[in-house]
């Protein structure tokens, strides 16, 4: 592992009177840091989907463009799996900004004439972007685990999870604004979001801290007196990547069940997300501004949808998450079918996209 990514060493404890105010301040600070940082990742994740209608106009085949955009998802899945182990052995303060920096720089290159010159170059750059995107979630999860205790983590995680919808919602309007400012669809869809993402890199690095112990604070379990089952001092020892991978990932059957189920959800989520711009432009005749706001609606609707899903599963179905998921998925299938077969007006298009976004996340 690169030495500069190693977790910061534990520091001696601060004086007792400083621990509580420092802990409270840093908990808010690191949460804002990973929220803004992860939202920044989504400014440079799906830009290619917004560019596809223009690439089709340039003469590129839609099927080949589909192959190119699939590289992003393939690389993202592999990276999230493999880089998660690397992240567990790295400083979150460095790992998250590094991945966002590499994603933004690759997005800048993708927006150049050379980057968009062939399907091969687009495939390679999309693969790299997907790989670097896999460096966003794992360090955020590391921060959540170290700074928030077991019985508060669910609420904090659900709030933080909104970050990717915020970033995903902003990319559509941002592309429209960038195109209006710079007079180029390449600038609107690639360069402008990438430059903003690089600014977010600085903010994330300044705000995020790796662990409480690296700041002279006790473990979060000790601070809040909130210990998970079988907790011991050994729980705070940094494991090797091999131990994490073989002991806690490969042998976890429930994790595999969830992963397989999630793969089918992603077929719909990214199928709509990746192809909506091309579909709306070619079939519905939307311009970039209308596409941008449709994109915004899809992502933004996920925020209340996610919150309502949690409330429904907790309060109505008493923690039986599978029932809530089944209801949501049946409703998704209905609205996707309506969107595909019966949506004939911009209003109906918007209603369907909002409903799908509300339900799919």
What does each model-identified segment do?
Residues 46, 73-81, 168-169, 299-307:
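Residue-level signature of mid-helix packing/kink "hotspots" within the transmembrane helices
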Residues 89-100, 315-329:
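Cytoplasmic membrane-interface "Motif A"-like loop-to-helix N-cap segments
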Residues 101-116, 330-344:
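C-terminal ends and interior cores of transmembrane alpha-helices
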Residues 80-91, 307-318:
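Helix-to-loop junctions at the C-terminal end of transmembrane segments
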Residues 160-213:
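Helix-loop-helix hairpin linking two adjacent transmembrane segments in secondary transporters
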């Amino acid at each position: 592992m690169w030495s500069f990514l190693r977790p910061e060493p534990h520091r001696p404890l601060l004086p007792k009177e400083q621990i509580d105010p420092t802990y409270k301040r840093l908990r808010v600070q690191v949460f804002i840091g990973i929220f803004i940082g992860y939202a920044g990742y989504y400014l440079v994740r799906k830009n290619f989907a917004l560019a596809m209608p223009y690439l089709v106009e340039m003469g590129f085949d839609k099927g080949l463009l589909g192959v190119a955009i699939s590289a992003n998802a393939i690389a993202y899945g592999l990276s999230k799996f493999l880089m998660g182990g690397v992240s567990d052995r790295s400083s979150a303060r460095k790992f998250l900004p590094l991945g966002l920096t590499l994603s933004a720089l690759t997005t800048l290159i993708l927006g150049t004439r050379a980057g968009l010159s062939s399907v091969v170059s687009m495939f390679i750059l999309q693969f790299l972007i997907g790989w670097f995107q896999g460096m966003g979630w794992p360090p955020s999860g590391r921060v959540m685990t170290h700074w928030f205790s077991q019985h508060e983590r669910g609420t904090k995680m659900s709030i933080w999870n909104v970050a990717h919808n915020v970033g995903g919602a902003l990319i559509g309007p941002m592309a429209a604004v960038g195109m209006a400012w710079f007079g180029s669809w390449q600038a609107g869809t690639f360069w402008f979001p990438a430059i903003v993402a690089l600014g977010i890199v600085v903010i994330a690095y300044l705000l995020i801290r790796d662990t409480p112990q690296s700041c002279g604070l006790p473990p979060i379990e000790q601070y809040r007196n909130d210990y998970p089952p079988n907790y011991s001092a050994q729980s705070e020892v940094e494991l090797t990547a091999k131990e994490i991978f073989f002991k806690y990932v490969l042998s976890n059957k429930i994790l595999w069940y969830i992963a397989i189920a999630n793969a089918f959800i992603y077929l719909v989520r990214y199928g709509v997300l990746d192809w909506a711009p091309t579909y709306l432009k070619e079939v519905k005749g939307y311009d970039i501004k209308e596409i941008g706001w449709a994109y915004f609606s899809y992502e933004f609707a996920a925020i209340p949808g996610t919150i309502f899903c949690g409330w429904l599963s907790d309060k109505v179905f008493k923690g039986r998450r599978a029932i809530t998921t089944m209801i949501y998925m049946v409703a998704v299938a209905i609205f996707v079918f309506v969107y595909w077969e019966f949506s004939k007006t911009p209003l109906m298009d918007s209603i369907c996209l909002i409903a799908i976004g509300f339900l799919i996340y």
